[in-house]
Amino acid sequence: MALERTLSIIKPDATKRNLTGKINAVFEGAGLRIVAQKRIQLTEKQAGAFYAVHKERPFYGSLVSSMIAEPVVVQVLQGENAVAKNREVMGATNPADAAEGTVRKLFAESIEANSVHGSDSLENAKNEISFFFAETEILP
């Protein structure tokens, strides 16, 4: 098992309902340690750049719009196999398909308002973490 870091974003649909603490408790209960966290208001330019990989997809515009509607909480989670563990803890993208006890089953409103984002690979985690955090902002 490898100690890894992954990026998590608590999305606007969850922050507007004051669910940050409850979602953090699920992450921590699963053995993921929050080593950096900040609440920010994304600009359209930032959200567009972050989700640039989806630019040609039909949902891109609504995704960017939803991510700038309210503040988000960006965080770095650390733990054994953190990327896979976080994806397991988040649950399926569609909350209707998510397993019981996962963040999306517990808190998501819909496939569009699914409460959290998590890196899907170790390489993407490194890129996504550096998008939001300087190394000096992350606890060892």
UniProtKB/Swiss-Prot annotation:
GO biological process: CTP biosynthetic process; GTP biosynthetic process; UTP biosynthetic process
Catalytic activity reported: a 2'-deoxyribonucleoside 5'-diphosphate + ATP = a 2'-deoxyribonucleoside 5'-triphosphate + ADP; a ribonucleoside 5'-diphosphate + ATP = a ribonucleoside 5'-triphosphate + ADP
SUPFAM superfamilies per the UniProt record, alphabetical: Nucleoside diphosphate kinase, NDK
Active site positions, chain numbering: H117
Alphabetical list of CDD domains matching this protein: NDPk_I
Cited PANTHER family: NUCLEOSIDE DIPHOSPHATE KINASE (PTHR46161), NUCLEOSIDE DIPHOSPHATE KINASE DDB_G0292928-RELATED (PTHR46161:SF3)
Cellular component aspect of the GO annotation: cytoplasm
Cell location: Cytoplasm
SMART domains linked: NDK
EC number in record: 2.7.4.6
UniProt keyword annotations, A-Z: ATP-binding, Cytoplasm, Kinase, Magnesium, Metal-binding, Nucleotide metabolism, Nucleotide-binding, Phosphoprotein, Transferase
Protein name as catalogued: Nucleoside diphosphate kinase
GO MF annotations, alphabetized: ATP binding; metal ion binding; nucleoside diphosphate kinase activity
Signal sequence extent: none
Subunit description: Homotetramer.
Provenance organism: Gluconobacter oxydans (strain 621H) (Gluconobacter suboxydans)
Pfam families recorded: NDK
Role summary: Major role in the synthesis of nucleoside triphosphates other than ATP. The ATP gamma phosphate is transferred to the NDP beta phosphate via a ping-pong mechanism, using a phosphorylated active-site intermediate.
Amino-acid positions noted as binding ATP in the UniProt annotation, renumbered to this chain: K11, F59, R87, T93, R104, N114
Family classification: Belongs to the NDK family.
Cofactor: Mg(2+)
